[in-house]
């Protein structure tokens, strides 16, 4: 176990780096929002019964509803070597494709059990993809929780998609990277069109056949901060990233769109004229919620990699006092624009040593703690209001029109705690 602190400077707040006991969900939870986003994709987890229970309970979907995800259970006979796992997987995939001809994109999703037994799903996916003539397209990625966070499931999924994207050639385009709700995509598309960016694509697209092309004339901007591997893969295809804060809250959304506009040489006056009204509406809608949050102390446990953009939004637009902002990984190249907007000397922590972080949290007695489900109930029992960080990934929180909804996600636990204390 090691702890080190980076000295403060004009550009970087103190950072506590810790490695110890962790409490996290695995990347399989990403299937919940990814299968809603890509509407003709199927996610086949190769794992244990525990994996199956996790995904089904997180999605809240009954098996008889025939959802677009399932689990190929690794049984004891598989672990004992009495069955050929490749043959078993081929049989399951063949049966699935015969039963669900509507599937256009099939992901084989690795898990902790499949990684422990060294099952090579990437090779299996390539073999099956060729066998079925790419109808459907078959890819693989890891949703394992071994040394990862739950949002890395989306990163791994999109990273697997990037090599399959068509070559854009000389076409100039903007690619928005990261799964967002359909309503958010529609809002962003209208705004980008209004400011004069003609070609806007989203990764992932709503349908497998609509995935964007990529090439040297592609500029991409991240909608989610946890997509480091996807960003690297896009760079390898020749695309260039537009650095910007993330589109959370009125300020973040405005700066995000302005960064894209500047990268495409759009007249700032035109951008301002398009954004003025939605930005003003968002700010006005935030006013009532700000009154409930201003002056409240909030502590972030590291869980989703959304912590720093959320902290920026809460501090600058809601008047919240940041006690500590923990994040599983601090990718400075993806976070520089956000770090510059945080209040000076905001206490950041990278990595997790849960016992030490709990000690710091209890000592500060914050009004609200943002954490994973495993910590929420014990903290609630101690009288500390909590917000599940995973809800912030499941909910539409990006863009101007969702700014007040995002703030309300933090205000509601405080209101509930106040009612319970009466």
UniProtKB/Swiss-Prot annotation:
Annotated gene: bchN
Q: What positions does the entry give for [4Fe-4S] cluster binding?
A: 26, 51, 112
Question: What is the native source organism of this protein?
Answer: Acidiphilium rubrum
Task: Indicate the enzyme's highest-level EC class.
Answer: oxidoreductase
Q: Please list the cofactors this protein needs.
A: [4Fe-4S] cluster
Q: Which residues form the signal peptide?
A: none
InterPro entries assigned to the protein according to its UniProt record, in alphabetical order: LIPOR_BchN/ChlN, Nase/OxRdtase_comp1, Protochl_reductN
Give the catalysed reaction(s), semicolon-separated. chlorophyllide a + oxidized 2[4Fe-4S]-[ferredoxin] + 2 ADP + 2 phosphate = protochlorophyllide a + reduced 2[4Fe-4S]-[ferredoxin] + 2 ATP + 2 H2O
Q: In which pathway does it act?
A: Porphyrin-containing compound metabolism; bacteriochlorophyll biosynthesis (light-independent)
UniProt KW Manganese keyword? no
Q: What is the lineage of its organism?
A: Bacteria, Pseudomonadati, Pseudomonadota, Alphaproteobacteria, Acetobacterales
This chain belongs to which protein, by name?
Light-independent protochlorophyllide reductase subunit N
Q: Which UniProt keywords are listed?
A: 4Fe-4S, ATP-binding, Bacteriochlorophyll biosynthesis, Chlorophyll biosynthesis, Iron, Iron-sulfur, Metal-binding, Nucleotide-binding, Oxidoreductase, Photosynthesis
UniProt EC number: 1.3.7.7
Task: Please indicate which superkingdom the organism of origin belongs to.
Answer: Bacteria
User: How is this protein organized at the quaternary level?
Assistant: Protochlorophyllide reductase is composed of three subunits; BchL, BchN and BchB. Forms a heterotetramer of two BchB and two BchN subunits.
SUPFAM superfamilies annotated for this entry?
Answer: Helical backbone' metal receptor (SSF53807)
A single GO BP annotation from the record? light-independent bacteriochlorophyll biosynthetic process
């Amino acid at each position: 176990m090691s702890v080190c602190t980076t000295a403060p400077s004009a550009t970087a707040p103190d950072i506590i780096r810790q490695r110890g006991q962790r409490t996290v969900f695995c990347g399989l939870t990403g299937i919940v929002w990814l299968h809603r986003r890509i509407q003709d994709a199927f996610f086949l987890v190769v794992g244990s019964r525990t994996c199956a229970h996790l995904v089904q309970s997180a999605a809240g979907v009954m098996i008889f509803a025939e959802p677009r995800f399932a689990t190929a259970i690794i049984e004891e006979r598989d672990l004992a070597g009495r069955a050929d796992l490749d043959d078993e997987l081929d049989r399951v995939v063949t049966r699935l494709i015969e039963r669900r001809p509507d599937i256009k994109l099939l992901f084989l999703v690795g898990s902790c059990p499949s990684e422990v037994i060294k099952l090579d799903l990437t090779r299996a996916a390539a073999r099956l993809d060729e066998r079925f003539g790419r109808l459907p397209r078959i890819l693989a990625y890891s949703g394992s929780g071994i040394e990862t966070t739950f949002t890395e499931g989306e990163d791994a999924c999109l990273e697997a998609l990037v090599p399959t994207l068509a070559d854009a050639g000389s076409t100039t385009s903007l690619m928005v990277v990261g799964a967002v709700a359909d309503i958010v995509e529609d809002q962003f598309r209208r705004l980008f069109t209004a400011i004069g960016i003609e070609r806007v694509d989203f990764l992932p697209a709503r349908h497998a056949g609509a995935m964007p092309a990529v090439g040297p004339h592609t500029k991409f901007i991240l909608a989610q901060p946890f997509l480091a591997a996807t960003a690297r893969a896009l760079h390898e295809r020749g695309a260039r990233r537009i650095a910007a804060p993330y589109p959370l809250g009125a300020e973040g959304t405005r700066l995000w769109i302005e960064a894209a506009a500047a990268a495409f040489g759009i007249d700032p006056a035109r951008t301002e004229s398009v954004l003025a009204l939605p930005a003003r509406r968002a700010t006005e809608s935030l006013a009532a919620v700000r009154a409930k949050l201003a002056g409240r102390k909030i502590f972030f446990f590291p869980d989703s990699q959304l912590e720093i953009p959320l902290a920026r939004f809460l501090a600058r637009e809601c008047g919240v006092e940041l006690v500590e902002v923990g994040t599983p990984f601090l990718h400075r190249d993806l976070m520089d624009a956000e770090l510059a907007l945080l209040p000076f000397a905001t206490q950041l922590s990278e990595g997790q040593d849960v016992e030490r972080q709990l000690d710091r949290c209890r000592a500060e007695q914050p009004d609200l703690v943002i954490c994973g489900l495993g910590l929420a109930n014990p903290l609630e029992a101690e009288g500390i209001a909590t917000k599940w960080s995973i809800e912030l990934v499941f909910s539409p929180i990006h863009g101007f029109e969702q700014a007040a909804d995002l703030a309300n996600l933090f205000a509601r636990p405080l209101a509930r705690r106040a009612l319970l204390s009466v």
